[in-house]
Structure formats: C-alpha cells, structure tokens
C-alpha cells in the first residue's frame, strides 16, 4: 500500500477521478502546504492567501495500480502546464503539486514522469515536495461529486475528466 498527495485544481475533481481507479483504497480531500493549521479550512484557503493547496490523499494498492500509472492519470486529468490555475479556478490554492511520502521510492518515479512529459515538449510547472501536515477537509467536501452529482460546477468539469480516464486508462477503471 502506498500514499501520495496530489493537487490538481479543485479537490472535488481530483477526488472523483481517483475514486474511479481500480486499486485505490481511499481518497481524502484536504489541504496541505500552508504554515498556519488554523487557516486550513475552506473559507480561508479559498482566499488564496494561506499558502494551503486543495489536495487529495490517495491511498492505493501498488500491486493493482502502480505509482507510475497513478501519476500518469494525475497528469492526464489536469493541466500541469499552467501555474496557479485549473480552468476557471484561479489562485495558488489550485496549483499543480505532488507531495511524496517516500523519497527513496516515490521521488525518482515522480521525477521520471515529469521528465518524460518535458521530453514531449510540455512546460511542466508541477511542484514536488516531501509530505508534511495534511489537514482533512470539512466533511461536506468528502465524496463530493457522488453526493452532489447535479451540482453545476461538477457537471461541467468532472465528466470530461472521467471520460479521459475511461478512454486512456480503461484497464484501471474501477467497476
């Protein structure tokens, strides 16, 4: 079992993608990156001034879905070339970031994945950091799309990501 923390825009969207991946045991929306734990809440993080990032903690069975595939899915389902923005979500809280939990095994895989994308001509701006304090987001953010499937923002953003997942990573789709 491995854990990696990913920030690729709104955590509702990234959460929904990884909930659909075979071998993913748990996806938890949360915040990471800020200095003041008291500001790790949706209202303050949305201000873009706390240093926190909307992220998801992905716990996965790497015998079913290897880290390389988790990263490929992550990079395929968000824009890793735009700093502090994913679509209409603008601000440092939406930046592209990977927090690794094991420097010896995960960091080289992350670096290889990013270098592969750069070799393809992409200007990757994704930040890579060792994991530090993860703050679980408020309960109403957990499993958000499954609880709010008709919410307008989700309807506009999540289905295209799931379509890309289905098309490019069919063998890793759950269910």
Swiss-Prot record:
Keywords: Oxidoreductase. One of its GO terms (molecular function) is L-methionine:thioredoxin-disulfide S-oxidoreductase activity. Its EC number is 1.8.4.11. InterPro entries: Met_Sox_Rdtase_MsrA_dom (IPR002569), Met_Sox_Rdtase_MsrA_sf (IPR036509). The active site is at residue 10. One of its GO terms (biological process) is protein modification process. NCBIfam families: msrA (TIGR00401). HAMAP family: MsrA. This is Peptide methionine sulfoxide reductase MsrA.
